[in-house]
From Swiss-Prot:
InterPro entries: Cyt_b/b6_C, Cyt_b/b6_C_sf, Cyt_b/b6_N, Cytb/b6-like_sf, Cytochrome_b, Cytochrome_b_C_euk/bac, Cytochrome_b_N_euk/bac, Di-haem_cyt_TM. The keyword Transport applies. The keyword Heme applies. One of its GO terms (cellular component) is mitochondrial inner membrane. This is Cytochrome b. The chain crosses the membrane at residues 33-53, 77-98, 113-133, 178-198, 226-246, 288-308, 320-340, 347-367.
Length: 379
């Protein structure tokens, strides 16, 4: 068996990626989230496939087909709630994975980091089009508001929005194409994830100390496969608790009402994992400015390798930058809270302050603190 896995053309790839892969001996549980994201992706594809067998992408029957899945399909309610809450677990793992990358300086592996940003954007696009499919009130109005933001693009904006809608409003054509996108994008994510792994295994993984670990590597199997299995068990436990005991806690009550173009909900908001970006969008009074800030709130991750002026790898030995990092995380939680609040005082003011802090922490405070740390080391 050992000779087969080392010599067989297909098994050799698996062997080099998951069995004999040289891995730093000191990587912590924060490194588990990559494998957890892979598990989340598989859960989403499998549950999504079974949902797609019963779902109809037609404005007159979409809402009823989701109700039919929950009421009449064997374990349809479980599949639907695993899929809906699986998306939340996916984004929790994704945010922690990115946060760990920033904290431990994984952005120096620029190819892996940039593919990761593409993965992040593709996952957000998949989640957005998926949220429209149940065709509830918040699905419809969320799709209308977010796609309408493209009209802020000069000259071609209005044409672009109508092209995406497939008409003059969000309707049957929009729902059909969003279903097509939602079906194909997870497979594109899978392809990008393999490229992400390919680039990672070219350079080797980072480690908590930020030091070169070439002299201290151990095989991935059995040490980290066991560690990953524990993480997967805890993830599945959390997902099952969420899906079985609190299935609707992260959803919106308005989505239990069928979509009605004549009745606007009092407060339109996306799913919780988009609220931080939505808060940044709303904090700028100008439409185009808001859209640009929304895009930059994600794309700003791409400038981390460029802003890396520190002589040390990661934040483990940099207490000043650590303070700024945790301020940034707290600020992100504030933005998430503000995104779910109505557009009125004091929420608008808090949102504007938090949005400024979000960009200031990354563009100014982190590089400045790194420069100070470099000068302290020289003393």
């Amino acid at each position: 068996m050992k000779i087969l896995r080392k010599n067989h053309p297909l098994l050799k790839i698996v062997n080099h990626s998951f069995i004999d892969l040289p891995t730093p001996s000191n990587i912590s549980s924060w490194w588990n989230f990559g494998s957890l994201l892979g598990v989340c992706l598989m859960i989403q594809i499998l549950t999504g496939l079974f949902l797609a067998m019963h779902y109809t992408s037609d404005t007159t029957t979409a809402f009823s087909s989701v109700a039919h899945i929950c009421r009449d399909v064997n374990y349809g309610w479980l599949i639907r709630y695993l899929h809906a809450n699986g998306a939340s677990m996916f984004f929790i793992c994704l945010f922690i994975h990115v946060g760990r990358g920033i904290y431990y300086g994984s952005y120096v592996l620029s190819e892996t980091w940039n593919i990761g940003i593409i993965l992040f954007l593709t996952t957000m696009a998949t989640a957005f089009v998926g949220y429209v499919l149940p065709w509830g009130q918040m699905s419809f109005w969320g799709a209308t508001v977010i796609t309408n933001l493209l009209s802020a693009i000069p000259y071609i904006g209005s044409t672009l929005v109508e092209w995406i809608w497939g008409g003059f409003s969000v309707d049957k054509a929009t729902l059909t194409r969003f279903f097509a996108f939602h079906f194909i994008l997870p497979f594109i994510i899978t392809a990008f994830a393999l490229v992400h792994l390919l680039f990672l295994h070219e350079t080797g993984s980072n480690n908590p100390s930020g030091l070169n670990s070439d002299s201290d590597k151990i095989p991935f199997h059995p040490y980290y496969t066991i560690k990953d299995l524990l993480g997967i068990f805890l993830l599945l436990l959390a997902l099952m608790i969420l899906a079985l005991f609190f299935p609707d806690v992260l959803g919106d009550p308005d989505n239990f009402t069928p979509a009605n173009p004549l009745n606007t909900p009092a407060h339109i908001k996306p799913e919780w994992y988009f609220l931080f970006a939505y808060a940044i969008l709303r904090s700028i009074p100008n439409k185009l400015g808001g859209v640009l800030a929304l895009i930059l709130s994600i794309l700003i991750l791409a400038i981390f390798p460029l802003l890396n002026v520190s002589k040390q790898h990661g934040l483990i030995f940099r207490p000043i930058t650590q303070t700024i990092y945790w301020t940034f995380i707290a600020n992100l939680l504030v933005l998430t809270w503000i995104g779910g609040q109505p557009v009125e005082y004091p929420f608008t003011t808090i949102g504007q302050i938090a949005s400024i802090t979000y960009f200031t922490x990354i563009i100014i405070l982190m590089p400045v603190s790194n420069t100070i740390x470099n000068n302290i080391i020289k003393l």
